[in-house]
Amino acid sequence: MRKKHLLKTIFSIWIIMSCAFFPVKVSADSADSIQPMVAFTFDDGPNKIYTKKLLDGLAKRNAKATFFVVGEKLDYESKTQTAQTTKENRELVARMAAEGHTVANHSYSHCWLSKSTPQKVTYELRKTSQLIEEITGKEVKYMRPPGGSALTALWVRNIAAPMITVCWGYYDTRDWECRNVEKMVNMIVENTFDGDIILLHDNYETSVETALSAMDILAKKGYRFVTVDELLNRNTGCGWTLDPTRIYCTMKDGDYSRLKRT
């Protein structure tokens, strides 16, 4: 009897450990559970020209994305743009939320948070979240520090809590300096995997073209384009919860919080 009880105990522990450390889909019977997912993310917006073009393209493809927006671009008190531009930017953010995209925090002034005081970091993040929530009516759950370096992320993650700090995967298109669409598309298509988080910027025409072209190719390979929120929470059926003290860069092979290579 004792031996049988011991075997049952060991088996129960094995089940629990399997659930904790291996990627388990929410529903093994659903199509989504076997369809590869990737999260396209866009920093530094919104941009009244290119963000609109991107949103139009995403809508045509039934694709979802995550936008890490700069708070200053949404603030009528900001002196960096006209009131009309601010109005248009806010309308774009409202559209993002209405169309099912995730709107996330990318600081207020796009400053280097690693060189800022804790008080400055708190202001940058809190002010931006307030502006986003004022527009969307939704809580801001995710943030990405400008620059996205591992050191910066490590510095701000505890201050940012309960927001979850999100970086990106193992490669960087550096689309802010590269204007070669074909080169960037090839980089994305050749390196993307199920659970990847891709970084681009929605304030460059070439970046928008890159994103949409890459999606067209990846879609033929069976990929579904989801928000960071959906990607990181796809294992909630196993009791998985996000930890604000970690930095999330991929969902590859259950390695949810691996820091990106620098």
What are these regions (language model features)?
Residues 42-44, 67-71, 105-107, 144-147, ...:
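A cross-domain feature marking catalytic cores of carbohydrate-active enzymes
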